[in-house]
Design a protein with these regions (language model features):
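Conserved ABC ATPase "signature" region
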Residues: 110-128, 176-179
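Conserved ABC ATPase signature
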Residues: 132-136, 140
Length: 247
C-alpha cells in the first residue's frame, strides 16, 4: 500500500508556500521530508496528515482519493499521526492513555487488555504504566505516544519532529522504535529539523526548497548531491548511517 500526494499546492493570500509537490511513502519504508525554514515542508506534511487542506492537488491512499477527508477519517483508514507538541493526556496514566484509543477500535475488552499489555511490553513502559502523563520524561512520553498511536494498527505513521525536546539517549531509543515499526511493514514519514538523526534512519528523503521538491533520493544520494550541500546541508556534512538490522 502507498500513501502519496500529487501536485499539492497551498497558498496563503498571495504567497504560494507549496508549489506542485508530489511525494509518496510505501508500507515498510522510512521517508524523510526535509528543508530549511519556510521551504514548505511543514505545510506539505500537514496536508498529508489532514490538518491543512490544499488549494490544488490530490492525496491518495493507494488509488483512493482522501484529499477532502479530515484527520480522524484518515486515522480510521490506517494513517496515524504523532504531533510535535505533547499529545498525551497529562492527567491520565500511561495505560489509560493507550486504553482510551483501544476502546474505539471495536475490540472486545479482553482483546483491548491483551493489546495493552503487548504495547506496554514492546515499548518498555512497565515501570511507568501507572504514571500520569505529566510525570513522564521526554523519552518516556514519546514512547507512550507512539504506543498509543499503534493502538489503531496503522499502516502509516506520520512523525512530526519526533527528535525534538528529547535527550541523546532518547533519540537513539526513538530511532530504534522507528526501525521496528518499519519491520512491522508500517510506512513512516518523518519531518524534522534534526538532519543527522533523520537521515541516519531514512530509506529515502525529499528535500523541499522554496516550496518545491529540490531533490529526492536515498539518504546517501541526498548527502552526496552538490546542490543539496550548497543550499541546505553545508559542504562539511557527513552522513552517519546506523545499522538497525538486528532490532
Amino acid at each position: 500500500m502507498k500513501l502519496r500526494t500529487y501536485d499539492l499546492v497551498k497558498k496563503y493570500r498571495n504567497r504560494t508556500v507549496v508549489n506542485h509537490v508530489s511525494i509518496e511513502v510505501s508500507q515498510g519504508e522510512i521517508v524523510g521530508l526535509l528543508g530549511p525554514n519556510g521551504a514548505g515542508k511543514t505545510t506539505t506534511f500537514y496536508m498529508t496528515v489532514g490538518l491543512v487542506m490544499p488549494n490544488n492537488g490530490k492525496i491518495f491512499l493507494d488509488e483512493k482519493d482522501i484529499t477532502d477527508e479530515p484527520i480522524y477519517k484518515r486515522a480510521r483508514k490506517g494513517i496515524g499521526y504523532l504531533a510535535q507538541e505533547e499529545s498525551i493526556f497529562r492527567k491520565m496514566s500511561v495505560e489509560d492513555n493507550i486504553l482510551s484509543v483501544l476502546e474505539m477500535t471495536g475490540r472486545t475488552r479482553k482483546e483491548q487488555i491483551e493489546r495493552l499489555e503487548s504495547l506496554i511490553s514492546e515499548f518498555g513502559l512497565e515501570k511507568v504504566r501507572r504514571n500520569t502523563g505529566e510525570r513522564l520524561s521526554g523519552g518516556e512520553r514519546r514512547r507512550a505516544e507512539i504506543a498509543r498511536c499503534l493502538a489503531i494498527d496503522p499502516k502509516f505513521i506520520m512523525l512530526d519532529e519526533p527528535f525534538a525536546g528529547v535527550d541523546p539517549i532518547a533519540v537513539q531509543d526513538i530511532q530504534t522504535i522507528v526501525a521496528r515499526l518499519k519491520n512491522k511493514n508500517i510506512g513512516i514519514l518523518i519531518t524534522d529539523h534534526n538532519v543527522y538523526e533523520t537521515l541516519s534512519i531514512t530509506d529515502r528523503a525529499y528535500l523541499l526548497f522554496e516550496g518545491k521538491v529540490l531533490f529526492q533520493g536515498t539518504a546517501e544520494e541526498l548527502a552526496e548531491n552538490e546542490v543539496v550541500r550548497e543550499k541546505y546541508l553545508g559542504k562539511d556534512f557527513e552522513l552517519r548511517r546506523k545499522d538497525f538490522s538486528n532490532v
